[in-house]
């Protein structure tokens, strides 16, 4: 298995004409079983042949796939590959080492049904300043649009596809959405007044017509363990952002509440 720390994620190596016996005796930081090369190469066909070795994260449970493939440069020979799995914990980097915003909580995203849309963690954004600074002079943002558009936030953080937490912030900063999701007036706490409508809109945004609140809530529960969003005890459909949104966004919750004319929620 391709599990040695010195292996790079992906490398391409062109082999010089050598015998198959010499090839099998080579060591790349670790020994590979003889079964790895199922079809011994013929000396006359080695010129221009190459192997690719690749490791990539393929599952939410932090497993890694190692793959070695054989092919011929410019030739018609079909590829063959052998795969192995290994833990990729050692490949991941901590949030503090990736971002200058050391005080921020790790803000990952989650969708157990279509994981390629959701990277396991928020990429470190290279922009200077807060999101508020980032969008201050953007002409497309105006009073008739959300204060925090998900697409703009995704661009600012460099996260790629729009993530659930970004989408929720968009809805929460759009006055036209206050009938089904809104701030309660208590810091970063918010309530899904109509969770089915929130799920429907999330499904529409991600082109997933079968999305419902049960599926969406699984993503929210994933955020519990990551200390991004917590469920408010004793209140139905009430949640709270517990990560450091203020440092990321550049807004304090009271500022957003005032911009959106949020009235304190008196419901128990």
Curated annotation (Swiss-Prot):
Annotated spans, Helix HI-2: 150-157
Region (Helix HI-1): 131-139
GO biological process, one term: positive regulation of endothelial cell migration
Location(s) in or outside the cell: Nucleus; Cytoplasm
UniProt region (Helix H4), positions on chain: 245-249
This protein's UniProt keywords: Cytoplasm, DNA-binding, Nucleus, Phosphoprotein, Transcription, Transcription regulation
GO MF terms, alphabetically ordered: DNA-binding transcription factor activity, RNA polymerase II-specific; sequence-specific DNA binding
Region annotation Helix H5: where it falls in the sequence: 253-259
SMART domains the UniProt entry points to: ETS (SM00413)
DNA-binding region: 162-242
Record entry for activity regulation: Autoinhibited by a module composed of four alpha helices (HI-1, HI-2, H4, and H5) that flank the DNA-binding ETS domain, reducing the affinity for DNA.
GO cellular component: cytoplasm; nucleus
Keyword DNA damage: no
Tagged with keyword Transcription regulation: yes
Chief localization: nucleus
Subunit composition and interactions: Binds DNA as a homodimer; homodimerization is required for transcription activation.
Recorded family membership: Belongs to the ETS family.
PANTHER family tied to this protein: ETS, ETS TRANSLOCATION VARIANT 2
Protein name: Protein c-ets-1-B
Gene for this chain: ets1-b
């Amino acid at each position: 298995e391709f599990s040695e720390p010195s292996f790079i994620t992906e490398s391409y190596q062109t082999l010089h004409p050598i015998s198959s016996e010499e090839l099998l005796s080579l060591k790349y930081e670790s020994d590979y079983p003889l079964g790895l090369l199922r079809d011994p190469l013929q000396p006359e066909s080695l010129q221009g042949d190459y192997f690719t070795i690749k490791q990539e994260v393929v599952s939410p449970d932090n497993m890694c796939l190692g793959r070695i493939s054989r092919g011929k440069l410019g030739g018609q020979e079909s590829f063959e590959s052998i795969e192995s799995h290994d833990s990729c914990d050692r490949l991941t980097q901590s949030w503090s080492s990736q971002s200058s915003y050391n005080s921020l909580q790790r803000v990952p995203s989650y969708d157990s049904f279509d994981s390629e849309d959701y990277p396991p963690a928020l990429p470190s954004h290279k922009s200077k300043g807060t999101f508020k600074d980032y969008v201050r002079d953007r002409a497309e943002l105006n009073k008739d649009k959300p204060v925090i558009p998900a697409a703009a936030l995704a661009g600012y953080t460099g996260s790629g596809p729009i993530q659930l937490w970004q989408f929720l912030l968009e809805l929460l900063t759009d006055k036209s959405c206050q009938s089904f999701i809104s701030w309660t007036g208590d810091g970063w706490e918010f309530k899904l007044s109509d969770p089915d409508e929130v799920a429907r809109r999330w499904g529409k945004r991600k082109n997933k017509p079968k999305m419902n609140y049960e599926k969406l809530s699984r993503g929210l529960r994933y955020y519990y363990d990551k200390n991004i969003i917590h469920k408010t005890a004793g209140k139905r459909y009430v949640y709270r952002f517990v990560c450091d949104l203020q440092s990321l966004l550049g807004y304090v919750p009271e500022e957003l509440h005032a911009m959106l004319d949020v009235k304190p929620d008196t419901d128990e």
